Structure formats: structure tokens, C-alpha cells
Amino acid sequence: MTRKQLYWSIGLTAVMITAGIIIYHRKRIKKKLTEAGDTAEGWIRPVVAKITSKFGHRTDPKTGKTNTFHNGIDLAVPSGTPIKSPMPGIVETVQSGGAGGNEIIIKHINGYKTGYAHLSKVLVTKGDEVKQGDLIAYSGNTGKSTGPHLHFTLTAPTGVKVDPQKMIYS
């Protein structure tokens, strides 16, 4: 082996080891973020839970009507599970009595809005300032619901509903 080939081999080995270390640490960081409920985009998850109904077209579980649009994701949690604000913001809406039962909408500092429905207890009022991680409510089974869960929505600054799974639960 020539000196040039030896240096090339050593350099390539060093690059491969460095790349392996970076990949290993990225996986560890992603695992820790997932365990803590955090995401790489700066959001935290309002609750760590299994997604039981995805964003998009589906069969309505209450009516059986096909091709209805589900504007958020459903997260399976027992009634009384603490719900946290995923990012700082201002409580824009607190309401009850509709299909979502007890609901909250928060406008966040990045222009996005998050919505929370079927809550058993709301701990904030309209105009409240919330910090990331603040306890805002407890999950429940109010409104048009088939069982205890959190219906979680994400609205872009343009006003269009987007899939929370892609941005916060990925």
C-alpha cells in the first residue's frame, strides 16, 4: 500500500466513524425527544399518546358517513389526562356545547393555532398568556365523542388546517 493510499484509507475511516457517531447521536436525541414529548421543530406534544384517528378523509365513527374530513388527530388518553401548551401563546377561544364539547384554541408566537376538544376540564380563559409546557386542560369525553380522547388540531398562519402528525407528532 502506498503512502497516498494509506492516508486515503485513514481519512475515509475517520469520515465513516464520524458519520456513524453523528447518526448514533441523532437517533439518541430523537429517542429522548420522543420520550419527553418534544419535537425537533421547537414544539412539545400536548400529550404523549397513540394516534387513533388521523387527519384527512375518513368514515365518521359516530354517524358512519363515509368520506368525511377529520380536521385534526385523535389521541387516545384516559379522561383526566393533563394537556400542555405545545408552544407559548395567547388563549384565543374557550367554548363549550358544540361537537367538540369543551374546547380551547391557542394562537402561538409563530402564527400557528392549536385546538383541543372533548376536554373534561379547562384551566385557562380567553386572553390568558401561556408558556410552553403550561397545563391548560384535562382530556375528557365531552361533545360528539366516542370515548375519552384529545382531538388536536393545527392551523397554519394562512388559516388552513394542517396535519399535526406531520409537524408535531412525526
Task: Report each predicted region and the residues it spans.
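Short hydrophobic beta/alpha edge segments that flank linear recognition/processing sites
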Residues: 75, 103-106, 131-143, 152
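Short polar/acidic secondary-structure junctions
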Residues: 80-81, 96-97, 141-144, 155
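Short histidine-centered loop motifs in beta-beta connectors
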Residues: 84, 94, 109-133, 157, ...
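Surface-exposed, glycine-biased beta-strand/turn segments
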Residues: 29-102, 132, 162
